[in-house]
Amino acid sequence: GGGGDRSLGVEYKPVLRPGEAVSVLVAWGDVVLAATGTLTAVSTDGRFLAFAHPFTNRGAVAFPLARSWIHQVVPSLDTPFKIGTPTSIVGIVTQDRPQAIGGFIGRFAPVMDISLNFRDVDSGTETFKRFKTASDPFMMTKVIPEMITGLVDNVWGRVGEGSAKLTLKIEGGRLAEG
């Protein structure tokens, strides 16, 4: 089960307008993690500002930007937020500052493809899961392990204690041997 193509499409010549919903993508596919907000401004050369607040506040970054569909706005005097679904990749977030996120529409961030094959030795079932993620050093060390753990819990489908044997194989170009 799983592993169906839930990847987002890419709009190579998108037209976005201030007020539209956009998301910063961390992961998409069988795992979705994104921050959704409002597009504030777009210049004629494709530069944009959005959110009017930071995402991670880490300065120079490279996250995909997606167009989003808003399901619900949760009002709050302290921290209002939107519940949305990314629908297509439209650009790259290159700056994550205290005042806003910014970047370019029609340019795209590098991403990693993560594929996981789970085999339950008790039942003999196999499950394939796949997602893409921003190629970001922080996300690689902090967020991706949590996503994989969540998939293990989800696929395992059991409640309570237990044991699992995990084998991890990392493949990719220009990886150091060792």
What are these language model-derived features?
Residues 1-178:
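Terminal presequence/propeptide segments associated with secretion/organelle targeting
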